[in-house]
């Protein structure tokens, strides 16, 4: 049962996007009202499901082993497994690839409809999905910042998937410290055209044979650049030159110097690249060139970075889902030991054992909580673009910015924990590579590392997002949790609301403690940043899960116990109860630790780490 059998289920996905989120509000916006009704998403989801089941997941076996092969050479350094070609072409031809990122297209889909498509694709093959998702992010930067001439030159073939795209940020000496990039760009006699010289590493989809050209977005500094991130520029550097008419030209002196041998996502080509080894690499500046050594590259790249951080959470969500469904399938079949309540009885399927049920419901609750967080954030992002009222657009943009680090860090952290629980459900077989959870655990670990490690996300959340615009957006974010707890109480969920009320009081104390530390001992904010991000995530996920449970209870009452959907809604209610009563209490532990404010990790001499 290697991860080549697609077990994903769509019922909760459709509940989230069709029943729970206010899709009528979004689809009434000018961008969508003449094109889509709420049921139109079914066709996209159903086609995507078939592609995932019949094409992507079967191809995933070769994605993991043998994966991509590095052969070197200037023109084609990486060979992908043969089955990748059909998978890549099928996705692009079905309109399920980089086309999503074209926000200027007439009749474009909402981003919140993209979320389940990416989730299911990642759940089918975490490796293969990277080949078109990085292209989509690169398109976003070009679309929003480049000249019309450059858009016309590059975007059509990138959107179609004929050309791929990358984000050329990381260097051997510049990982999280982006401002340390050493790659240089030298102006030429042609305005906007620069000669490129430098090295990049860990470049996802840096070279492959699925696209005829790779368009790299490269961060680089001019010789007179200001130090740090303010001196960074972003340039379009194609592997093969692109002529003015959009045709492909000669090799542009972009060399693949090696492929990384990774723990997971073996089917994703992660490369080291060298630009200008022969002094003949050129790229186009995106937007205006630098002024007095100050570039706009970081601001431009962060448009792609924020998109990819949200997508990273969605990729992690796919691994959570596939690992859970693999564990569930196994636990329904595996027979071992009598029930605890009938020790002399026959052996039963392990799903009947208490601790196995706990592990399964933990995974299910994490899957549904993280899905609610992700989809809500995509929904906010859509409204930040498409709502008619400027004040409303600003509000939803603020909410999106606050939640992106939660989506990236919390979901990817929980993917690692949840896939571990899936392995545990399988017992010794979970440790065997022929079973899906082992590969999914290896594959999902990257998500807490790339697009800014999860501590970077925690820094961003606690030091930027909570204080932006004098803290007003964060106050509104907290207030919407308070408003929900004050106005939505239901006697059927009295215990859950009581738990959330207590956790919310604790979270407010966490926030006030953090603000006091900011003034008196900011190093403590760094020390507790990750735990505070998790506390915020548990609070918002608890609220979202309880909101879904209220809707599920209402639907169940309307439909009755005999309805075919009754078990789904009962599962929604039980899963929300579990999350609120078993996961949300983690907020109390964070507050207790913050009250103690233990600084052992800071105080211990380096020499004592032995």
From Swiss-Prot:
Q: What induces it?
A: Highly expressed during syntrophic growth with butyrate (at protein level). Seems to be constitutively expressed.
Q: Where in the cell is it found?
A: Cytoplasm
- What is its cofactor? FAD
GO CC annotation:
cytoplasm; plasma membrane
Q: What is its main location?
A: cytoplasm
Membership in a protein family = Belongs to the acyl-CoA dehydrogenase family.
Pathway as given in its UniProt record: Lipid metabolism; butanoate metabolism
Q: Catalytic residues per the record?
A: 451 (proton acceptor)
- The main enzyme category here is oxidoreductase
**Record function comment:** Involved in syntrophic growth of S.wolfei with butyrate, as part of the butyrate oxidation pathway. Catalyzes the oxidation of butanoyl-CoA to crotonyl-CoA. Probably passes the electrons released by this reaction on to electron-transfer flavoproteins (EtfAB) to finally generate hydrogen and/or formate.
For this entry, list what GO says about its biological process: butyrate metabolic process
Known InterPro entries for this protein?
A: Acyl-CoA_dh-like_C_dom, Acyl-CoA_Oxase/DH_mid-dom, Acyl-CoA_Oxase/DH_mid-dom_sf, AcylCo_DH-like_C, AcylCo_DH/oxidase_C, AcylCoA_DH/ox_N_sf, AcylCoA_DH/oxidase_NM_dom_sf, Diverse_Acyl-CoA_DH
GO terms assigned for molecular function: flavin adenine dinucleotide binding; short-chain fatty acyl-CoA dehydrogenase activity
Which reactions appear under catalytic activity for this entry? butanoyl-CoA + oxidized [electron-transfer flavoprotein] + H(+) = (2E)-butenoyl-CoA + reduced [electron-transfer flavoprotein]; a short-chain 2,3-saturated fatty acyl-CoA + oxidized [electron-transfer flavoprotein] + H(+) = a short-chain (2E)-enoyl-CoA + reduced [electron-transfer flavoprotein]
Q: What is this protein called?
A: Butyryl-CoA dehydrogenase Swol_1933
**Keywords from the named record:** Cytoplasm, FAD, Fatty acid metabolism, Flavoprotein, Lipid metabolism, Oxidoreductase
Which PANTHER family does the UniProt record give?
A: ACYL-COA DEHYDROGENASE, BROAD-SPECIFICITY LINEAR ACYL-COA DEHYDROGENASE FADE5
What's a Pfam family in this record? Acyl-CoA_dh_M
EC number of the protein: 1.3.8.1
